[in-house]
C-alpha cells in the first residue's frame, strides 16, 4: 500500500520531491500523467507528475482529481499536493482551486500550506515567504514570465485564490514542539480557518511538521515537508529506498528552457566549457520554420565531439526575456519554444541520444512527453546544489 501519494503540478517539482522521499527512506516511483495501470510493486511513495501549474484552472482541477481518484483506488494513506517552493501562483493561479477541489473530494475541512525548503534558501516566517535573504516579491520571482510573484504574504495569496480564511502557525510555535503545533492547528480549525500557512526556518521545523501532520489526509507544500513526512513513515518498518534510476551510458544533450536567475548563472558557466547554442525564438514561431530549425539544431548537436554534452538553451536574462515577450507575446513565445524542445528531443532520441539533462519545469514536461517516458524509479540525489 502506498503511504504517500504525491500530485505534483510540474515535472521538475515531481522529481524534486521524489528525490527527497528517497533520500529520507521511502522507495519511490514517479509517473508522468495520470496512471491507468496497476500500482508499481515494492514502493512506499508514488509521485504523479502533471503539467498543471500554468494551464487553465478547470484543466488543472480535473487532472488533479483524476490523479487523486487513482491514488484512492490504490489505498493511498496520505495525499500530498506538491507545488513550487516559490509558490508560483497569483490570484488567478491554480494552487488555491486545486487545493479546494482536493479538500472537497477528500471531505476534509482543513489543510496546510508549507512551501518552505530551507536547504534551498526558501523559508517562511510569520507567513512571509523568503527566497534566500529577500522577500518573495523582491526576488527574481517578481519577473516570472508566467506567474509573477508580487506579494510575499502567503495567507493573502492563498485567500485571493481560494474559498476560505488562512491562518499562520508561527516559528515561535514550532520552537515549542509538536504538541504546541497540533494545538495551534486545532485552534485555527475550531475558529473557522480553512487553511494554515506553516512557518519553517530550519529542517528541524520540517521534522516537526511531519510529525504533526503524520495522519492528515491531505497536505500541500513544496518539497521540504516531504522530509518530515518521509521520516515519519519510514520509521514504521525502517525501509531503505533502493538505489535505482542510474543514468544510462551513451550520448547526451543539455536542454535549458528555464529563465530563473539560478539557471542563467548555470548556463553562463556551462557555455564557457561546453558547446552551446542559443535558441532563436523568431525561428520557432511558424510550423514551417520550426520543423526545419529543430532539424538544424539536431544536426548541430549530433555533430559535436566534445566530452561534455552540448547545450541548447532558451534561457534568457530578465531584460532579454521582457524584450522577447514584448516582441512576440509571452504565451506565444513560450509555447513556440516548448514545441521546439519537444521536436528536438524526439529527433535526437531517434538518432541515438540516450541521456537528456533538462532545465525548467515546462521544458522537462514537454521533453518527457515527446520521449514517451511514462515513469521512473527515483535514485539517489546526485547534486543537492542543483535543486530548484
UniProtKB/Swiss-Prot annotation:
Catalytic activity reported: 3-dehydro-L-erythronate + ATP = 3-dehydro-4-O-phospho-L-erythronate + ADP + H(+); 3-dehydro-D-erythronate + ATP = 3-dehydro-4-O-phospho-D-erythronate + ADP + H(+)
InterPro entries: 4-carb_acid_sugar_kinase_N, 4-carb_acid_sugar_kinase_N_sf, NBD_C, NBD_C_sf, OtnK
Residues where ATP binds: 258, 360-363
One Pfam family it belongs to: SBD_N
Keyword Kinase listed: yes
Signal peptide per UniProt: none
MF GO annotations: ATP binding; kinase activity
The keyword Secreted belongs to this UniProt entry's keyword annotation: no
EC number per UniProt: 2.7.1.217
Keywords: ATP-binding, Carbohydrate metabolism, Kinase, Nucleotide-binding, Transferase
Family: Belongs to the four-carbon acid sugar kinase family.
Function statement: Catalyzes the ATP-dependent phosphorylation of 3-oxo-tetronate to 3-oxo-tetronate 4-phosphate.
Protein name from the UniProt record: 3-oxo-tetronate kinase
Source organism per UniProt: Escherichia coli (strain K12)
Underlying gene: otnK
Amino acid at each position: 500500500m502506498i503511504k504517500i501519494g504525491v500530485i505534483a503540478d510540474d515535472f521538475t517539482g515531481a522529481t524534486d520531491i521524489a528525490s527527497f522521499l528517497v533520500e529520507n527512506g521511502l522507495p519511490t516511483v514517479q509517473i508522468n500523467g495520470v496512471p491507468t495501470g496497476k500500482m508499481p510493486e515494492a514502493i512506499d511513495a508514488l509521485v504523479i507528475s502533471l503539467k498543471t501549474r500554468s494551464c487553465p484552472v478547470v484543466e488543472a482541477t480535473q487532472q488533479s482529481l483524476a490523479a487523486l481518484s487513482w491514488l484512492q483506488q490504490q489505498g493511498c494513506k496520505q495525499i500530498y499536493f506538491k507545488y513550487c517552493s516559490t509558490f508560483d501562483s497569483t490570484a488567478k493561479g491554480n494552487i488555491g482551486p486545486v487545493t479546494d477541489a482536493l479538500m472537497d473530494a477528500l471531505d476534509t475541512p482543513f489543510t496546510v500550506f508549507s512551501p518552505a525548503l530551507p536547504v534551498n534558501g526558501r523559508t517562511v516566517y510569520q507567513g512571509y515567504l523568503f527566497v534566500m535573504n529577500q522577500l518573495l516579491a523582491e526576488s527574481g520571482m517578481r519577473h516570472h514570465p508566467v506567474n509573477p510573484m508580487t506579494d510575499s504574504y502567503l495567507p493573502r495569496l492563498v485567500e485571493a485564490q481560494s474559498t476560505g480564511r488562512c491562518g499562520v502557525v508561527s516559528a515561535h510555535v514550532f520552537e515549542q514542539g509538536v504538541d504546541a503545533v497540533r494545538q495551534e492547528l486545532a485552534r485555527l480549525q475550531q475558529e473557522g480557518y480553512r487553511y494554515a500557512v506553516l512557518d519553517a526556518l530550519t529542517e528541524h521545523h520540517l521534522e516537526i511538521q511531519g510529525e504533526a501532520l503524520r495522519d492528515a489526509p491531505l497536505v500541500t507544500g513544496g518539497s521540504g515537508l516531504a522530509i518530515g513526512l518521509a521520516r515519519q513513515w519510514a520509521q514504521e518498518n525502517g525501509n531503505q529506498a533502493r538505489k535505482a534510476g542510474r543514468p544510462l551510458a551513451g550520448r547526451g544533450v543539455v536542454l535549458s528552457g528555464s529563465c530563473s536567475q539560478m539557471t542563467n548563472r548555470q548556463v553562463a558557466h556551462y557555455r564557457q566549457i561546453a558547446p552551446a547554442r542559443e535558441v532563436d525564438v523568431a525561428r520557432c514561431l511558424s510550423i514551417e520554420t520550426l520543423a526545419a530549425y529543430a532539424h538544424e539544431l539536431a544536426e548541430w548537436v549530433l555533430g559535436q565531439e566534445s566530452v561534455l554534452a552540448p547545450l541548447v538553451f532558451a534561457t534568457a536574462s530578465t531584460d532579454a526575456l521582457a524584450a522577447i515577450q514584448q516582441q512576440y507575446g509571452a504565451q506565444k513565445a513560450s509555447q513556440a519554444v516548448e514545441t521546439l524542445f519537444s521536436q528536438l528531443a524526439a529527433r535526437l532520441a531517434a538518432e541515438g541520444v540516450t541521456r537528456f539533462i533538462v532545465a525548467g519545469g515546462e521544458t522537462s514536461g514537454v521533453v518527457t512527453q515527446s520521449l514517451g517516458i511514462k515513469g521512473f524509479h527515483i535514485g539517489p540525489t546526485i547534486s543537492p546544489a542543483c535543486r530548484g
